[in-house]
């Protein structure tokens, strides 16, 4: 039986191409996740939005 958590990719909104990978519970978090996280390319905290892992 498959797990309840999906792997997702958090993509930087600064357009640098930097991303974090994490997982989320589909049942508890049905919408798209958004976090303020550190982007080392621009050296600032920027908004990261959920995207698909290819």
From Swiss-Prot:
InterPro entries in UniProt: Ribosomal_bL33, Ribosomal_bL33_CS, Ribosomal_bL33_sf, Ribosomal_zn-bd
Q: Does the keyword Ribonucleoprotein apply?
A: yes
From the Swiss-Prot or TrEMBL record, what is one GO molecular function term? structural constituent of ribosome
Q: Which GO terms describe its biological process?
A: translation
Q: Which is a Pfam family this sequence falls into? A: Ribosomal_L33
- Provide one Gene Ontology cellular component: cytosolic large ribosomal subunit
Statement: the UniProt record of this protein carries the keyword Cytoplasm: no
**Regions that span the bilayer:** none
Q: What keywords would UniProt list here? A: Ribonucleoprotein, Ribosomal protein
Instruction: State the similarity comment.
Output: Belongs to the bacterial ribosomal protein bL33 family.
* Name the record gives this protein: Large ribosomal subunit protein bL33
UniProt lists the gene as rpmG
């Amino acid at each position: 039986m498959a797990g309840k958590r999906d792997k997702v990719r958090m993509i930087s909104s600064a357009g640098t191409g930097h991303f974090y990978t994490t997982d989320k519970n589909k049942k508890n978090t049905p919408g798209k996740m958004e976090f303020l996280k550190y982007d080392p390319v621009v050296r600032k905290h920027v908004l990261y939005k959920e995207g698909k892992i290819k």
